[in-house]
Amino acid sequence: MAISDGHGLPLAVHVASASPHETKLVEPTLQQRFLAEAPERLIGDRAYDSDPLDVQLRERFGVQLVAPHKCTRSKAPTQDGRVLRRYRRRWKIERLFAWLHNFRRVVIRWEYYPENFLGMVQLACAVILLRYL
């Protein structure tokens, strides 16, 4: 899982197995961020439509979660259209993943230990940041 800024540059990366749901990985990813301060808002897809996650991010990190509601949502909507305008900027995180796919060791996980793979992902993020400077 990765978190990027408004330019698509990496702010945090976290490596986990493929089995946990993405909402379970948000907090560990925010704890492993490269900067001291947390981002103002997180923009996610419909999988992040979770009221407990929204409250948890707001209370622990002061982060606003922007995610469109699922079509099967039974509770009342918590976001209006003004907040969801920021969802259009979600392509920037997809650009970060495209940049990460330029590194062969990151595309397919060949490493047995997750620490080694995390090191490769962090090295790729460092190269991306150096290219931006």
Write out the residue ranges for each language-model feature.
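Active-site beta-loop-alpha junctions of metal-dependent nucleic acid enzymes
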Residues: 14-36, 41
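Short conserved beta-strand segments at catalytic cores or DNA/RNA-binding microdomains
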Residues: 1-10, 19, 26
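Well-ordered beta-strand positions
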Residues: 3-4, 14, 92
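Helix-centered, glycine/charged polyanion-binding patches within enzymatic domains
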Residues: 19, 37-113
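Charged phosphate-binding loop/patch that engages nucleotide di/tri-phosphates or the phosphate backbone
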Residues: 120-133
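A residue-level signal for conserved active-site and pocket-lining positions in enzyme catalytic cores
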Residues: 8, 94, 123
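Conserved, well-structured core segments
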Residues: 1, 12, 97-98, 118-122
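Short small-residue beta-strand/loop micro-motif enriched in glycine and branched aliphatics
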Residues: 10-13, 108
